[in-house]
From Swiss-Prot:
Family: Belongs to the SAICAR synthetase family.
Domain of life according to the entry: Bacteria
Stated name of the protein: Phosphoribosylaminoimidazole-succinocarboxamide synthase
Organism name: Prochlorococcus marinus (strain MIT 9211)
Keywords: ATP-binding, Ligase, Nucleotide-binding, Purine biosynthesis
One Pfam family from the record: SAICAR_synt
Keyword ATP-binding: yes
HAMAP family: SAICAR_synth
E.C. number(s) listed in UniProt: 6.3.2.6
Pathway where it operates: Purine metabolism; IMP biosynthesis via de novo pathway; 5-amino-1-(5-phospho-D-ribosyl)imidazole-4-carboxamide from 5-amino-1-(5-phospho-D-ribosyl)imidazole-4-carboxylate: step 1/2
Reaction(s) catalysed by this chain's protein: 5-amino-1-(5-phospho-D-ribosyl)imidazole-4-carboxylate + L-aspartate + ATP = (2S)-2-[5-amino-1-(5-phospho-beta-D-ribosyl)imidazole-4-carboxamido]succinate + ADP + phosphate + 2 H(+)
Length: 243
């Protein structure tokens, strides 16, 4: 039975969250908003919310099938997702396979350079601070996780990377990097939360050699390349098995 949204809880950059009739379940509405540079750049793109909801649902189900616990419970309709309520750890967990984005600004690595092994970075989730990169010492100082939780986060993040990288490879998409969020449910279990979509993953089309055309993620919006919704639609089409 389709649940009706209860009280409004939170309005984020791309999603709005509501209570349900159960205390440990929430409804997430995926919006058409596109943002970049900590929301300094903003636009509404018709159809984006529907695509991100469907892509995220498919990828959450893939992870669940492979034994990775997520907050996903089901899809209510094209833009609404039912999820477990979690206490989100205020960390952006970024896994990188290919040098791109901030990594190229902070190191001598060239854009597109394959990393010798996946790199895991933690960023403090705070727009006012600019989501700063955290060292192990700073993570310990802030006390955002226990050492045991951090090891579990690392294990889950690398497992997710292997699953997604292999899956995307089969549909001619290169997983450059991606961002995860995780949180604890009422039973204290660590779950992958938020969303997994072209808003949070860099995906390059291996069917194209053109450095701009191959971009099928939010970098199209960041770099004013256009065709954002069309690129997201191409990803969903391939995920659903339509070459």
């Amino acid at each position: 039975m389709k649940k009706q949204p209860g009280s409004f809880l939170f309005d984020g950059k791309a999603k709005t969250i509501f209570t349900t009739d159960k205390p440990y379940e929430l409804l997430v509405h995926f919006k058409n908003d596109a943002t970049a540079f900590n929301a300094l750049k903003h636009a509404e793109l018709e159809g984006k919310g529907k695509l991100n909801c469907q892509i995220s649902a498919s990828l959450f189900q893939l992870l669940e099938k492979e034994g990775v616990p997520t907050h996903f419970l089901g899809v209510q309709d094209e833009t609404w997702m039912l999820v477990q309520k979690v206490d989100v750890i205020p960390l952006e967990i970024v896994v990188r396979n290919i040098a791109c984005g901030s990594l190229c600004k902070e190191t001598p690595l060239e854009r597109g350079e394959k990393l010798s092994s996946p790199l895991l970075d933690f960023y403090y989730k705070d727009d006012q601070l600019g989501d700063p990169l955290l060292t192990d010492a700073r993570l310990n100082l802030l006390g955002l996780t226990t050492s045991g939780q951090r090891l579990e986060i690392q294990s889950i993040a690398f497992k997710v990377n292997n699953i997604l990288k292999n899956f995307f490879q089969k549909i001619d998409l290169l997983l450059v990097d991606f961002k995860l969020e995780m949180g604890l449910n009422n039973a204290g279990e660590l779950l992958v939360a938020d969303e997994i979509s072209p808003d949070s993953c860099r995906l390059w089309d291996q069917r194209s050699d053109d450095p701009e055309q191959r971009i099928l993620d939010k970098d199209r919006f960041r770099q004013d390349l256009g065709g954002v919704v069309e690129a997201y639609g191409e990803i969903l089409k391939r995920i659903q098995g339509n070459p």
